[in-house]
């Protein structure tokens, strides 16, 4: 207010007004500033001044033939004077208006296709909702953000090849289109842009916008997905923010979001399996996100998130050299340290072995809702400057920094025993033990930390153990700042190694990431994630495990059937039956398995007892390590829908229901697919129909290799012999007939011969 009064005062003196409005600008320094160099120093002024002239535009000479000298109002459209220094004509802005209204018309069909990104942006803005403007201090931190909504994720080189192929197909130069996305995009664009009259350079430029992710390092408070970044200038200023809901989503943001969810699910699941690294790779290879292979997305997508980076490390891709602890990304900005094992005692006199970092180091800490600068010496926090969205976020950052400092007072603040375990029931390492402990309750930690008097520093404020702000006192070495800490801007990637337990290390052996760092946050993916791996069946709960297990058996029935009769142990050990075991009550798993295996053995031994439906129904139970017992069961229990439900050994139940007439199998009322029983079940003599054109020679003969399924017989050449698995799970030797005429008689003789061959 004072300043405004002062200015008003000055302006009221007539001399001031005169100086400001009348004096010429003849100061040498000013003239120099505006005339030296080719760079325009004041583009908007230059534009206004140019447009005030009569002929500010130059055009090709041909314009004089295409545009009249005067328009209907008699205004001159172009000058007879040619432009100094070029053979172009000087043109009035009115000529542009005339051209737009009366110039030649061209087909507009390609415009929405070429300028797709612009048209889409207009649609998003049209349907977006702008809310109220709030005035408040904005804590902005610079983050690397995607500024180009709606792009594919090709590398610059891949995009260049696609653009050359689409826009300049006849140019020389080697172009290798290898990836699936490259080929699809090229084909699509070539069709769309047939007979396109828009200048090739413009098409190339617009294609680049569509194909490549462009990132900038920008100050952001709030949403970082590309549909928010495109309106950054409308939604946040230095002291204000405007609420905004985008009017549409773009695939690249959805891919980023879904990739993070898929990666988290996969890492969490892999961590609890017998061989985490092998499982993780198997799942990454067999997962699709929105119809694209996850492996392809990982190769192209620069998203940096703990789980995503673990997956990338497993694939041998480079990742950022920053490391993760407590959900914060740490980047060392100066100093160095050496690591040494040290034993420390907690407040509960429990011994912990920690790797102490000896030496002075400075780090930036960046999290979702808080950022900080941390300076530490050996087991001592020198200074922590933290900023965050709210008290809770600031507290989280302080806890992580205190644990990271490895200070003695932090370790002594532990009350009770530390025995936190990960998802696989293994003890966490000491640093994560401490972190979990204080994340649960940090009262003692803050209380014991110690407080100090503080100096009044602009933009900084103290924080007390109960998290209240103060200008006089603060926890030792800790200040809260109004300013955020920028994210690490470099896009440098380093070579890393990953061990069996998914711990990622840089080449100096520092651990950058581990499964403990993967967020437990659950979200709903924007794009469909298809996990083909049986390890992920349990992600949607017990029902999904049940349905998926039976669907898998039905899909692979032909091979399962052969294994069932010839190599049952291998079949029982298939990983696809692993998830199912969690549904079977632990105490009885072994007995069920022993019972089912015995039942199956009888089926193999006794002619005519083979029963497709029953084998499928009971097979998953045989996968557990069997306990030998004399127990017989008429029903088996599975834990779904929060309680035990029964599967009847003989007959249908709500869990497993097979309809003989429609051949449909329903699991818990959900359709699980069509089940074709073997033709011989229930009706003797039908094998012959299946074996038409084959002569049954006798019992199985191992020299002719493993048994084929009936479907595979069709590949035999005439006169070729093979073992074949017929209905009852029995194997006989057959030969494909040399002549087709005798096929009819096969039907009658086959039945007799099968009986003889088996008995």
UniProtKB/Swiss-Prot annotation:
Single GO BP term:
symbiont-mediated suppression of host mRNA transcription via inhibition of RNA polymerase II activity
Give the source's domain of life in one word.
Answer: Viruses
Checking InterPro entries in the record gives: Flu_PB2_2nd, Flu_PB2_6th, Flu_PB2_C, Flu_PB2_CAP-bd, Flu_PB2_middle, Flu_PB2_N, INV_PB2, PB2_helical
List the GO cellular component terms.
host cell mitochondrion; host cell nucleus; virion component
> Residue ranges for motif Nuclear localization signal?
736-739
Q: Where in the cell is it found?
A: Virion; Host nucleus; Host mitochondrion
Q: Which SUPFAM superfamilies match?
A: PB2 C-terminal domain-like (SSF160453)
Give the record's keywords alphabetically: Cap snatching, Eukaryotic host gene expression shutoff by virus, Eukaryotic host transcription shutoff by virus, Host gene expression shutoff by virus, Host mitochondrion, Host nucleus, Host-virus interaction, Inhibition of host innate immune response by virus, Inhibition of host MAVS by virus, Inhibition of host RLR pathway by virus, Inhibition of host RNA polymerase II by virus, mRNA capping, mRNA processing, Viral immunoevasion, Viral transcription, Virion
Single annotated GO MF: RNA binding
The record's listing under Pfam families reads: Flu_PB2_1st (PF20947), Flu_PB2_2nd (PF20948), Flu_PB2_3rd (PF20949), Flu_PB2_4th (PF20950), Flu_PB2_5th (PF00604), Flu_PB2_6th (PF20951), Flu_PB2_7th (PF20952)
Entry annotated with the keyword Oxidoreductase: no
For site (Mammalian adaptation), what residue positions does UniProt give? 627
HAMAP family, A to Z: INV_PB2
Please give the subunit comment from the record.
Influenza RNA polymerase is composed of three subunits: PB1, PB2 and PA. Interacts (via N-terminus) with PB1 (via C-terminus). Interacts with nucleoprotein NP (via N-terminus). Interacts (via N-terminus) with host MAVS (via N-terminus); this interaction inhibits host innate immune response.
Entry similarity comment: Belongs to the influenza viruses PB2 family.
Q: What does this protein do?
A: Plays an essential role in transcription initiation and cap-stealing mechanism, in which cellular capped pre-mRNAs are used to generate primers for viral transcription. Recognizes and binds the 7-methylguanosine-containing cap of the target pre-RNA which is subsequently cleaved after 10-13 nucleotides by the viral protein PA. Plays a role in the initiation of the viral genome replication and modulates the activity of the ribonucleoprotein (RNP) complex.
Q: What is this protein called?
A: Polymerase basic protein 2
Q: Which organism is it from?
A: Influenza A virus (strain A/Memphis/1/1971 H3N2)
Output the lineage of the source organism.
Answer: Viruses, Riboviria, Orthornavirae, Negarnaviricota, Polyploviricotina
Gene label: PB2
């Amino acid at each position: 207010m004072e300043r405004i009064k002062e200015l008003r005062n000055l302006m009221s003196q007539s001399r001031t007004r005169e100086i400001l409005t009348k004096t010429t600008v003849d100061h040498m320094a000013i003239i120099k500033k505006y005339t030296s160099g080719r760079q325009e120093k004041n583009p908007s002024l230059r534009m206004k001044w140019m447009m005030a002239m009569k002929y500010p535009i130059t055009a090709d000479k041909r314009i004089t033939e295409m545009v009249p000298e005067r328009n209907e109002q008699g205004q001159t459209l172009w000058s007879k004077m040619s432009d100094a220094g070029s053979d172009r004509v000087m043109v009035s802005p009115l000529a542009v208006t005339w051209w737009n209204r009366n110039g030649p018309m061209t087909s507009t069909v390609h415009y929405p296709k070429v300028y797709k990104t612009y048209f889409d942006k207009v649609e998003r803005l049209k349907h977006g909702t702008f809310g109220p403007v709030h005035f408040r201090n904005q804590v902005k931190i610079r983050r690397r953000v995607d500024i180009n909504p709606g792009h594919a994720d090709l590398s610059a080189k891949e995009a260049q090849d696609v653009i050359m192929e689409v826009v300049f197909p006849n140019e020389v130069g080697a172009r290798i289109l290898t990836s699936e996305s490259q080929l699809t995009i090229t084909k699509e664009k070539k069709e769309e842009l047939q007979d396109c009259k828009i200048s090739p350079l413009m098409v190339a430029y617009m294609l680049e916008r569509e194909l490549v992710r462009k990132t900038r390092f920008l100050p952001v408070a709030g949403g970082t997905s590309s549909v928010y970044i495109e309106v950054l200038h409308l939604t946040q200023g230095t002291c204000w923010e405007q609420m905004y809901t985008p009017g549409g989503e773009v695939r690249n943001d959805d891919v980023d979001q879904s990739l993070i969810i898929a990666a988290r699910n996969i890492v969490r699941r892999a961590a609890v399996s017998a061989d985490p690294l092998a499982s993780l790779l198997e799942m990454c290879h067999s997962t699709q996100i929105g119809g694209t292979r996850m492996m392809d997305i990982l190769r192209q997508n620069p998203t940096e998130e703990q789980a995503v980076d673990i997956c990338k490390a497993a694939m041998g891709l480079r990742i950022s050299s920053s490391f993760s602890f407590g959900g914060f990304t740490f980047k060392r900005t100066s100093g160095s340290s050496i690591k040494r094992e040290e034993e420390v005692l907690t407040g509960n006199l429990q011994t912990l072995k920690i790797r102490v970092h000896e030496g002075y180091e400075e780090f930036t800490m960046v999290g979702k809702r808080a950022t900080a600068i941390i300076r530490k010496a050996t087991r001592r926090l020198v200074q922590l400057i933290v900023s965050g969205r709210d008290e809770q976020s600031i507290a989280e950052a302080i806890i992580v920094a205190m644990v990271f400092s490895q200070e003695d007072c932090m370790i002594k603040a532990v009350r009770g025993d530390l025995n936190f375990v990960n998802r696989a029931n293994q003890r966490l390492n000491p640093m994560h033990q401490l972190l979990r402990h204080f994340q649960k309750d940090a009262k003692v930690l803050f209380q014991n930390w110690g407080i100090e008097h503080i100096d009044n520093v602009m933009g900084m404020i103290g924080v007390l153990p109960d998290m209240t702000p103060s200008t006089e006192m603060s926890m030792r070495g800790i200040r809260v700042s109004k300013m955020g800490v920028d994210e690490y801007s470099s896009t440098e990637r380093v070579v890393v190694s990953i061990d069996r337990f998914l711990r990622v290390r840089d080449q100096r052996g520092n651990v950058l990431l581990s499964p403990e760092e993967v967020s437990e946050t659950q979200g709903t993916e924007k794009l469909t994630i298809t996990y083909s791996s049986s390890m992920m069946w349990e992600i949607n709960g017990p029902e999904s495990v049940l349905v998926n297990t039976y669907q898998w058996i039905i899909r692979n029935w032909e091979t399962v059937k052969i294994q069932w009769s010839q190599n049952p142990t291998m079949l029982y050990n298939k990983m696809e039956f692993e998830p199912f075991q969690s549904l079977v009550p632990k105490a009885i798993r072994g007995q069920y398995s022993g019972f089912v295996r015995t039942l199956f053995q009888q089926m193999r031994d006794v002619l005519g007892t083979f029963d497709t439906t029953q084998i499928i129904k009971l097979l998953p139970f045989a996968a557990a390590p069997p306990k030998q017992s004399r127990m017989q069961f008429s029903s088996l229990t599975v834990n779904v829908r929060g309680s035990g439900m029964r599967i009847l050994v003989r007959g249908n139940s709500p869990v497993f229901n097979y309809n003989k007439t429609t051949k449909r199998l329903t699991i818990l009322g959900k359709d699980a697919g069509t089940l074709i029983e073997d033709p011989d079940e229930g009706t003797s003599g039908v094998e012959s129909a299946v074996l038409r054109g084959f002569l049954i020679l006798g019992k199985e003969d191992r020299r002719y290799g493993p048994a084929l399924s009936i479907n595979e017989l069709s590949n035999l050449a005439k006169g070729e012999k093979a073992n074949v698995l017929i209905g009852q799970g029995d194997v006989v030797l057959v030969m494909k007939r040399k002549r087709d005429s005798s096929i009819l008689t096969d039907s009658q003789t086959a039945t007799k011969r099968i009986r003889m061959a088996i008995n």
